[in-house]
Amino acid sequence: MSDKNVLIQVKDLKKAFGTNQVLDGITTDICQGEVVAVIGPSGSGKSTFLRSLNLLEVPTGGQILFEGTDITDPKVDINRHRQKIGMVFQQFNLFPHKTVKQNIMLAPVELKLMTKEEASKKADELLARVGLPDKANAYPDMLSGGQKQRIAIARSLAMNPDVMLFDEPTSALDPEMVGEVLELMKELAQSGMTM
């Protein structure tokens, strides 16, 4: 691990909800290209930990350094850092009134990171990468659970993140759909994505 760049450094991370101490002093380094799994029983703080890494949950103590910047510092523009952190949730969170391609293009265009033309090209590339090029004009309700999750992954990849966080990405899927999502995650890991 020492020969790789540390991408995320967590120091004594704490998170409490009222008197319930969910995270109590987590310290870890996550290096570029590394794949890390957080394993534990239901209610043990796994989702809280992941959500803390991009400040969707604000820690009550400790530090999180992302690419060397302390993102827990209130002076830091967290939205700039969130653009580099892809997040895939248990639920797909796709916009039902937008096509698959529009869902993928939305953030890069709205944040002015790409023109519509660039985002369209990127969306086509990502749809091919996740094995769904024929679904560009489909709406989310026309897709299976596995297809929706692959689109959610493509949407996160559209921002060209440095790291991808997955919060139980297969738990809401039928058993036969799990394999296609795990295969995509395996391909991402093999390509060097930090996860």
Predicted regions and their residues:
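ABC family nucleotide-binding domain
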Residues: 5-195
